Amino acid sequence: MVSVINTVDTSHEDMIHDAQMDYYGTRLATCSSDRSVKIFDVRNGGQILVADLRGHEGPVWQVAWAHPMYGNILASCSYDRKVIIWKEENGTWEKTHEHTGHDSSVNSVCWAPHDYGLILACGSSDGAISLLTYTGLGQWEVKKINNAHTIGCNAVSWAPAVVPGSLIDQPSGQKPNYIKKFASGGCDNLIKLWKEEEDGQWKEEQKLEAHSDWVRDVAWAPSIGLPTSTIASCSQDGRVFVWTCDDASGNTWSPKLLHKFNDVVWHVSWSITANILAVSGGDNKVTLWKESVDGQWVCISDVNKGQGPVSTSVTEGQQNDQ
C-alpha cells in the first residue's frame, strides 16, 4: 500500500509532462507545455521554488538529473528540437550547453551510468538518437545514430554499468569490463538494444517485437548482481511487457505480459531494487506491480493521479477487472 506524502503546487501554466527527483530525493524538477523547467526543494515535505528555467521555445517533454558526482546538472528536451543542459553554479542555475542537432521534437533524454562519464542519450521524432559526451572545458562530443527508429524515437534508457552477475562472478579487486548498452523505443512498434563497439561506434544489437503500436517508454532495470537483465516497455496498445535475458551473450530475450490496460500507457519506472515497477497511463492512475513467487506480476497498489491522498491495495483478483 502506498499513500501520497506530499503534493507540490508547481504553478505551471499548462500540462506537466515529467517530474523527476534528484539522486538524494531532496529536489524535484518538473517540465511543462508552458515551455518552462522548474526546480523545487522538497525536503521535509515542503516546496521551495529554487529555479524557473526558461530557454525552450516549445513544450518541454522530459527532464533528467545527472549523477551528483558531476555537480548539480539537469538535462531537458523539447518539441523545439533542442536539448538544454543546465548547471547550478554558486546557487544559480544557468544554461551550460544547448544541443540543436535534431530536425524534429526531442522526446527523451537519459544520462548514462556515472561510471562511463557524463554521457547523455537523446531520442527524437526525426528517427535519430544522439549521444552527447562531455570532454572537458565546456565541450561536448556528439555521436548520432541516424534512422534508429522509423518515424521517430520516443524513449531511451541505459543498461546498468554493473555487468549482470558481476557481484558474484567478478574476481576481487578487478574492475568490471563494462560494455555500454542502452534500449530505445519508437514509433515502429519496436524496442531496440544498442551496443558500443570497440571503435566507439554504436551498433544495433537486438530488436524486441511484441507491441502492436508505438512504444511510449522503456526502462532498463537496475542490476542487483544477478545474472539476469530486465527491461520494461509500454505502448500505445495499452500493454506493458517485462523482458528478461538470462544468457551471458544477451541474445535471447523473453517477453512476459504484465497487464493489458484499457488506455495508452505512457511511462514505466523501476524501484532502485528492481523488484517493483511503477506504471502510469491514460487511465489517470499510477499502479505498482511486483512479481510473485510463481512468476506472475501482481498489482500491489494504485494511486489516482490528481485525487489527493488516495491509497488502495489491489489484489490479483481485482487487477483483472481494471
Swiss-Prot record:
Gene3D superfamilies in the cross-refs: YVTN repeat-like/Quinoprotein amine dehydrogenase
GO biological process, any: protein exit from endoplasmic reticulum
UniProt xrefs under InterPro entries: Sec13/Seh1_fam (IPR037363), WD40/YVTN_repeat-like_dom_sf (IPR015943), WD40_repeat_dom_sf (IPR036322), WD40_rpt (IPR001680)
Localization in the cell: Cytoplasmic vesicle, COPII-coated vesicle membrane; Endoplasmic reticulum membrane; Nucleus, Nuclear pore complex; Lysosome membrane
Keywords tagged on the record: Acetylation, Cytoplasmic vesicle, Endoplasmic reticulum, ER-Golgi transport, Lysosome, Membrane, mRNA transport, Nuclear pore complex, Nucleus, Phosphoprotein, Protein transport, Repeat, Translocation, Transport, WD repeat
Residues with N-acetylvaline modification: V2
Residues carrying Phosphoserine: S184
Placement of WD repeats on the sequence: 11-50, 55-96, 101-144, 148-204, 210-253, 260-299
Domain of life: Eukaryota
Matches recorded under SUPFAM superfamilies: WD40 repeat-like (SSF50978)
GO CC terms in record: COPII vesicle coat; endoplasmic reticulum membrane; GATOR2 complex; lysosomal membrane; nuclear pore outer ring
Any Pfam family the entry gives: WD40
UniProt topology in membrane: Peripheral membrane protein
GO MF terms, alphabetically ordered: structural molecule activity
Chief subcellular location: membrane
Inhibition and activation profile: The GATOR2 complex is negatively regulated by the upstream amino acid sensors CASTOR1 and SESN2, which sequester the GATOR2 complex in absence of amino acids. In the presence of abundant amino acids, GATOR2 is released from CASTOR1 and SESN2 and activated.
Quaternary organization: At the nuclear pore: component of the Y-shaped Nup107-160 subcomplex of the nuclear pore complex (NPC). The Nup107-160 subcomplex includes NUP160, NUP133, NUP107, NUP98, NUP85, NUP43, NUP37, SEH1 and SEC13. At the COPII coat complex: interacts with SEC31A and SEC31B. Interacts with SEC16A. Interacts with SEC16B. Component of the GATOR2 subcomplex, composed of MIOS, SEC13, SEH1L, WDR24 and WDR59. The GATOR2 complex interacts with CASTOR1 and CASTOR2; the interaction is negatively regulated by arginine.
Record-stated family: Belongs to the WD repeat SEC13 family.
Function, in words: Functions as a component of the nuclear pore complex (NPC) and the COPII coat. At the endoplasmic reticulum, SEC13 is involved in the biogenesis of COPII-coated vesicles. Required for the exit of adipsin (CFD/ADN), an adipocyte-secreted protein from the endoplasmic reticulum.
Protein name per the record: Protein SEC13 homolog
Lineage start: Eukaryota, Metazoa, Chordata, Craniata, Vertebrata
Gene: SEC13
